[in-house]
Amino acid sequence: MAEAAESAPAPPPAEPAAKKKKQQPKKAAAARGAAKSKKPSSGPSVSEQIVTAVSASKERSGVSLAALKKTLAAGGYDVDKNNSRLKLALKVTKETLLQVKGSGASGSFKLNKKQLQSKDKAAAKKKAPLAAEAKKPAAAAKKTAKSPKKPKKVSAAAKSPKKLKKPAKAAKSPAKKTAVKPKVAAKSPAKAKAAKPKVAKAKKAAPKKK
């Protein structure tokens, strides 16, 4: 009995394993949160936001960096954390933006309308060949759909044997020729008989001269 009592208190050391299991879900949740934070935002890029902000402004002298920061902050962009990105974006978008005043990222900026027009034309040229290529398969599909109508020509060729009725007319024409010839032969003996009596009358008139 004493041995059984001594062996009974052994189960308590299993508690730290249970604590480890409870700690694991917390670590997994933290890792998921970090992964979510690393995912890129689905919104527009910094350069796109800058271009939209400059295009929206009506100032003739251009938009300053401070005004750009204000408009970006109003749109929900964290300007303080992404200040370096904002400056890089201004350098990248120099083709679409014209720096009216200042140098570098500091200064005022305007939209480069000529550059935008050239980009629009280039995009339109790219779209035109793609549209032409898309039309070609559609035209080819229409031709293949129309091609099964060709068997109708075979049916027209099958109807052509009806033209063989013409030899029947040729068979009728010899019958007419044979019917006309006997009439001519019948008339010629009658003329010969009528000519003979005239010769006999001439012979009788000769003795009167003596």
Swiss-Prot record:
Pfam families: Linker_histone. SUPFAM superfamilies: Winged helix' DNA-binding domain (SSF46785). GO terms for cellular component: nucleosome; nucleus. It comes from the Eukaryota. InterPro entries: H1/H5 (IPR005819), Histone_H1/H5_H15 (IPR005818), WH-like_DNA-bd_sf (IPR036388), WH_DNA-bd_sf (IPR036390). Keywords: Chromosome, DNA-binding, Nucleus. Residues 1-49, 101-210 are annotated as: Disordered. Transmembrane segments: none annotated. Residues 42-113 form the H15 domain. GO terms for molecular function: DNA binding; structural constituent of chromatin. GO terms for biological process: nucleosome assembly. It is found in: Nucleus; Chromosome. Residues 26-45, 129-142, 181-192 have a biased composition (Low complexity). The keyword Ligase does not apply. Residues 143-153, 160-180, 193-210 have a biased composition (Basic residues). Histones H1 are necessary for the condensation of nucleosome chains into higher-order structures. Belongs to the histone H1/H5 family. This is Histone H1A. It comes from Xenopus laevis. The lineage of its organism: Eukaryota, Metazoa, Chordata, Craniata, Vertebrata.
